[in-house]
Amino acid sequence: MAEGKGRVCVTGGTGFLGSWIIKSLLENGYSVNTTIRADPERKRDVSFLTNLPGASEKLHFFNADLSNPDSFAAAIEGCVGIFHTASPIDFAVSEPEEIVTKRTVDGALGILKACVNSKTVKRFIYTSSGSAVSFNGKDKDVLDESDWSDVDLLRSVKPFGWNYAVSKTLAEKAVLEFGEQNGIDVVTLILPFIVGRFVCPKLPDSIEKALVLVLGKKEQIGVTRFHMVHVDDVARAHIYLLENSVPGGRYNCSPFIVPIEEMSQLLSAKYPEYQILTVDELKEIKGARLPDLNTKKLVDAGFDFKYTIEDMFDDAIQCCKEKGYL
């Protein structure tokens, strides 16, 4: 069977980002292996993936779990690129941080070892998070790829999502170090809130948080400025980093930072049918003020962001309407 641009693997394919990357890869002529957790009773509905254009010929599913990194070997065999988007998310801290971190780090390293053994993988692209950059205690207005979150500070202060931030920080450091030591090309893409359309049936957490003013969930506002990127730009950036001979290492992918007051004005003007919290009502909110994330390195590497702030909100709101969340 002809494989067009080649075969790639996307871990975490049923997630918000993973499913959109799969959609984009299929549209770009790739054959795609994706991993999902075992479902012996076949209760999981993956029709949102199998119904994608081209999926019947070019999308293949493999059972794998981060708790057993060796389980990814079959999915990686014969692939030229790996997009590792799967990551445990436990904002409720239902498990000890050490367990979540070990699963995240060991899972990523196990997948990398399978990449080395495959002899075919040319580049491993790890989906990281702005939380691996922003929590460092530095008094800086702008952060870049040289900045890392301070794990000791996170474990001491325990801000919202601290366990996730620790796991992503240590996993990103581990995959970059593994790449250097084992001669495999590793790129990490550092993401903020991802906003836009979605093909997965569940309302993605990042969209729920980005639309907090539309959904009327004032109590969930934890920051006063939102780093944002359109999901399609994220998928495009992942594919760009696979297809182009840019240097390995870290890349920030956060083109916009939107103050919550600006968000209120934009949404209330365009969507008067929703009871958007006003600027005056937002003055009492004392959330964290995150620094900017500089995306110059990614842009200098030749990547162009396609979508505006308005595009992100328009696409997310329209999709939420279509799926019954609004």
Curated annotation (Swiss-Prot):
pH note: Optimum pH is 6.0.
Inducing factors: Transiently up-regulated by fungal elicitors, peaking 6 hours after elicitor treatment.
Record carries keyword Nucleotide-binding: no
Temperature-related activity annotation: Optimum temperature is 30 degrees Celsius.
EC primary class: oxidoreductase
Molecular function GO labels: (3R)-2'-hydroxyisoflavanone reductase activity
Swiss-Prot/TrEMBL catalytic activity: a (3R,4R)-4,2'-dihydroxyisoflavan + NADP(+) = a (3R)-2'-hydroxyisoflavanone + NADPH + H(+)
Tissue: Detected in roots, and at lower levels in root nodules. Not detected in petioles, leaf and stem.
GO biological process: defense response; flavonoid biosynthetic process
Subunit structure: Monomer.
Protein family: Belongs to the NAD(P)-dependent epimerase/dehydratase family. Dihydroflavonol-4-reductase subfamily.
Name by which UniProt lists this protein: Vestitone reductase
Source organism of the structure: Medicago sativa (Alfalfa)
Lineage, uppermost ranks: Eukaryota, Viridiplantae, Streptophyta, Embryophyta, Tracheophyta
